[in-house]
Amino acid sequence: MAVGKNKRLSKGKKGLKKRVVDPFTRKEWFDIKAPTTFENRAVGKTLINKSTGLKNAADGLKGRVIEVNLADLQGSEDHAYRKVKLRVDEVQGKNLLTNFHGIDFTSDKLRSLVRKWQSLVEANVTVKTADDYYLRVFAIAFTKRQPNQVKKTTYAQSSKLREIRKKMMEIMQREVSNSTLAQLTQKLIPEVIGREIEKSTQTIFPLQNVHIRKVKLLKQPKFDLGNLMSLHGEGASEEKGKKVSSGFKDVVLESV
């Protein structure tokens, strides 16, 4: 008779348990700081495994993208329908210095805008900012009832929609190409470009709910620590940034 190993009889001693190691003992927390473009700079915290040997924690944090609600950054629920993406570019002690990486609408807001009896106009353009960031900017708009209109629907003709789309692309191209990334962020928060499109297309067809619904970063220039530090001010640990006014105006330099 062949003799084999009886698994039932070869169990270890009763009462001995495997030692459980808390995984958080090997991790450390870092504070995420938003640029001074936003009113509240303290975004939150993130964690990563501690530096061991040749493996540096800072290398794993650089390039990490964090999504934050704009209402938290501005301290106002009026901006709750927009999400901002921030990218970690530099690690200073326990602070992570971030830069703007994109903006988007929440899905519930986007769905609430689409209704019956009106035309939807969408346009997008790929453009380079004044400081060499390549962005793809998406705009959305809807037709609205004209004064004293009796007709139920507000559909626009295809020729009118083409004119509106062309005007939207022209305005987006102009506004983005003449601004740095920080200046563009200041325009996006109070919806300056959307209001400009709405005003410029009044002669073609009246519009409503005109928004820059999404900005996507395609390519960024070579990393410059000086530019990043200027975005975060001299004190990178400050909790408050600059308040963006709702009536943003471009600074016009007088000719010398």
UniProtKB/Swiss-Prot annotation:
Protein localization: Cytoplasm
Protein's UniProt name: Small ribosomal subunit protein eS1
Residues forming coiled coils: none
Keyword Transcription regulation attached: no
Protein family membership: Belongs to the eukaryotic ribosomal protein eS1 family.
Record keywords: Acetylation, Cytoplasm, Ribonucleoprotein, Ribosomal protein
A GO CC annotation given for this chain: cytosolic small ribosomal subunit
GO annotation (BP), single: translation
Gene Ontology MF terms: structural constituent of ribosome
N-acetylalanine, modified sites: 2
Entry keyword annotation includes Lyase: no
Subunit structure: Component of the small ribosomal subunit. Mature ribosomes consist of a small (40S) and a large (60S) subunit. The 40S subunit contains about 33 different proteins and 1 molecule of RNA (18S). The 60S subunit contains about 49 different proteins and 3 molecules of RNA (25S, 5.8S and 5S).
InterPro entries: Ribosomal_eS1, Ribosomal_eS1_euk
Species for this entry: Meyerozyma guilliermondii (strain ATCC 6260 / CBS 566 / DSM 6381 / JCM 1539 / NBRC 10279 / NRRL Y-324) (Yeast)
